[in-house]
Swiss-Prot record:
<keyword id="KW-0479">Metal-binding</keyword>
<dbReference type="GO" id="GO:0000166">
    <property type="term" value="F:nucleotide binding"/>
</dbReference>
<protein>
    <recommendedName>
        <fullName>5'-deoxynucleotidase PM0747</fullName>
        <ecNumber>3.1.3.89</ecNumber>
    </recommendedName>
</protein>
<feature type="binding site">
    <location>
        <position position="137"/>
    </location>
    <ligand>
        <name>a divalent metal cation</name>
    </ligand>
</feature>
<dbReference type="Pfam" id="PF12917">
    <property type="entry name" value="YfbR-like"/>
</dbReference>
<feature type="binding site">
    <location>
        <position position="33"/>
    </location>
    <ligand>
        <name>a divalent metal cation</name>
    </ligand>
</feature>
<dbReference type="InterPro" id="IPR006674">
    <property type="entry name" value="HD_domain"/>
</dbReference>
<dbReference type="GO" id="GO:0002953">
    <property type="term" value="F:5'-deoxynucleotidase activity"/>
</dbReference>
<feature type="binding site">
    <location>
        <position position="68"/>
    </location>
    <ligand>
        <name>a divalent metal cation</name>
    </ligand>
</feature>
<dbReference type="InterPro" id="IPR003607">
    <property type="entry name" value="HD/PDEase_dom"/>
</dbReference>
<comment type="similarity">
    <text>Belongs to the 5DNU family.</text>
</comment>
<dbReference type="InterPro" id="IPR022971">
    <property type="entry name" value="YfbR"/>
</dbReference>
<comment type="function">
    <text>Catalyzes the strictly specific dephosphorylation of 2'-deoxyribonucleoside 5'-monophosphates.</text>
</comment>
<dbReference type="GO" id="GO:0046872">
    <property type="term" value="F:metal ion binding"/>
</dbReference>
<feature type="binding site">
    <location>
        <position position="33"/>
    </location>
    <ligand>
        <name>substrate</name>
    </ligand>
</feature>
<keyword id="KW-0378">Hydrolase</keyword>
<comment type="subunit">
    <text>Homodimer.</text>
</comment>
Amino acid sequence: MKISHFFACLDRLRLIQRWSLMRNIEKENLAEHSLQVAFVAHALAVIKNKFYQGHLNPDRIAVMAMYHDTSEIFTGDLPTPIKYFNPKITQAYKEIENAAEAHLLALLPKELQADFAPYLDSTQFSAQEKHVVKQADLICAYVKAQFELENGNQEFKAAKARLETLMKTWHSDEMRYFIEVFIPSFGKPIDEITL
């Protein structure tokens, strides 16, 4: 059998630091972020189905979210101000991300590629699935910014304001539900959230 480097590459997610241009009270790596996004994306899909006439597959969305930033194994975590500096850079970076996704998928044994492609190849995601994963990504970034600010790190003030604006753009009923029901618990002491 031929050796595959796929999971060794995924293991590198824990080495990629997010928010790399900002001082962090608590560092966050891409593996941690991806798991949190998967939790939130799954919840958003369940909430949409339960309360807002959705027809999403929460399990599929959770796995998509687990893999949503895996292209950064090859590209690194490009800071947002650079990624969205102008439309040409944004488009070029999207092409790089697509090439990185294809390369990662090609690291799998050929017999497994078709089974993983629906979660790794963003061209196979529906607009609604992408929307839910993006919402989860924004919520998790917002939670991080809020944590940093609550712990005295003013470096995240502009990031939180930018995220609040983006969250309004990506808003949905399920996102509002999640924010109202779950976000207030973040930052509370362990004794308050476990009793």
